[in-house]
């Protein structure tokens, strides 16, 4: 090989340090390759020389992970040996580590909340009810532990506490996961009972996380309150004797919490926000609802009430009135334009009156006179819910049954949702309906008996309560009307509560028989239920549509500590046999159930669907009305698309 074929080599530096510096670049290790064995030494001159030791390069990231893993394992082992912590200094004002007794009771309450209730609930509401009940359980457990420490001078030793904590951490997480998974099976069974698809989305980790987050939030708030109380007591202790400082500090703290919850959270928070949302909704109009062209409807031509003044539910009610042509097409016989009168919560100034709801009642009678309502075959007074809602199924069923020869009148007392109205002004429901009934009956009394329309009353949910509160007793209801159709009355409704309490022996509370069904009957599946008992059913008649699974019917503060009668055997037809009563827990389950009671199909939950057809057919059947007519109208009402 000639010298021209050789690869040019860089000149070698005579300084060994220069070589070292040149080889110290980032790719120095990559150029080494495999060990060539003995070779020229590092210094000048030929001859083999020893190669220096190669130091292996260890990656930094795996080393860090190993160190962290060892540290975590050490802490886990340390925690396993002593799975709790005491306050590092007795001067700490608030306990830092949870109390074992309280945590155990919180866990038991959470497990209890996983049991099924009246209607299926989604996973996120299960997490909410689990967190609320766990917080209640923690509060009770903490109170019991404090009482025990106060009464018993000797405390368990460290070894016993360690074993108890170890048992808790070993059992509680696994049991919670298994019970959450088992609750999904129970929810699917309940869905099948209530004619829903068995498919269900049930996020076990999210349920646990939501419950833990709510429990942690409640615990944080409680400890902040306690810290404030202890700090206040210590400050007062510098000025007052110790007992007086304790009493004064506790009283001031309780007062501050009460004022904060009542004024800030409840009044300015929940109620104020709900009022603003409801007021904005009340000013709108549902898509598809238009101003009526019939002079027989409030808000129409010649009405004493402007269309814009009726409110959201008033416009829904009057703007969806069926026409004479539609009623004729359905019945095949000549029909009339039905009368619908609706008076909003704020009547025109010209009808102002100092008496509660007297102005609205007077205006309603004026509208009834204007539309010729007292010349119709049936006049129905409808109690409204908190928002002013009237069930369209109830109204249209009566109008189709009588081919429009009807008049329906309602007065709005609030635009708030029913649950807010119940909390704020429940009494207004009864006052408004009573004022309307008094005014209507006074006008009817002025007519000859043979020219009076049949007077019936109806209402659903808080509207049913409004009707019942107007009469007070079942005897007054029977004496003052020609019949009543009431659906889903809340537990605090006076008449239905009396009927369930004084029911005939042997009849269940969810389907009570009263006075052998002489005038009043209850039903969930009215086509069959209203035929029982077999004794004669005399007029006037009262029909209650009451679903066994309706949480609105059964919710009561008594659920906190008392086992309800509706959980006694036999259970209702759509109640799962796996339902149980637990103190405090069942109350919150039923409270949450009310929020989803419209998520099922009729006749389950708080949905009554076309049951109004059977109800009206039993209470005030038109002359010549047959069972076939009821079946046909039930199918129509049940399958048509409601206007609102």
Regions found by a protein language model. Give the residues of each.
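Generic low-complexity, intrinsically disordered sequence content enriched
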Residues: 36, 69-72, 81, 637, ...
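N-terminal acidic, proline/glycine-rich, low-complexity intrinsically disordered segments
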Residues: 1-17
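Short glycine-enriched nucleophile-adjacent loop
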Residues: 464-475
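Short, Lys/Arg-rich, polar N-terminal cytosolic tail immediately upstream
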Residues: 8, 48-93
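C-terminal His-loop and adjacent cap/lid subdomain of alpha/beta-hydrolase
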Residues: 88-453, 473-644
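Intrinsically disordered, low-complexity proline-rich tandem-repeat tracts
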Residues: 14-22, 26-68
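Gly/Ala-rich beta-loop-alpha elbow adjacent to hydrolase catalytic centers
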Residues: 457-464
